[in-house]
């Protein structure tokens, strides 16, 4: 095995020297796991707010254009259902919290489906029984379980089979939800091992730009401070 590298010990540059560039490291921070920092950044920084919300807002702005031969009265009923369940807003929130925290879910609520640990059977959904989506971010009481989907024909192959929804204040389990009743929203895709580390969620969109953001804020703050001394 051969390796090529540049080195100039006299000038202290290149491989194996005391060059300042050689001291640069990229430690694994996993900032996505810092809920308090992400929340604080989102609430206080307009740049972060725009990074999180711009793409979801663009995706949802025109909603959808349905071309069908279905009778107009049925289309009206569907529009009324969308308004009643606020499905457009719920999907927007799911995408935003997925981008901010790296993961969120939308639990599909169906009237009469009390045992949510059972797979969702579309044939058993009666007209008017859709109750909407319940959005939970990854820090809001939803926990992927260790059992994974093993059917390669399933769209969720390799992802958790069940999700536990808990009341974190009391520690009690609210529901055990089958993956077919869950819509996943994640941030940036991660390599497999990192995905496992993040409990099968993704990476926050904030993590990749955090260092640049701190540089910008520090420079802007210093410039503002200098105006008082001018």
Predicted regions and their residues:
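Structured, contiguous alpha/beta core segments that scaffold functional sites
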Residues: 1-53, 72, 76-230
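Glycan-recognition surfaces in beta-rich domains, encompassing non-catalytic CBMs
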Residues: 64
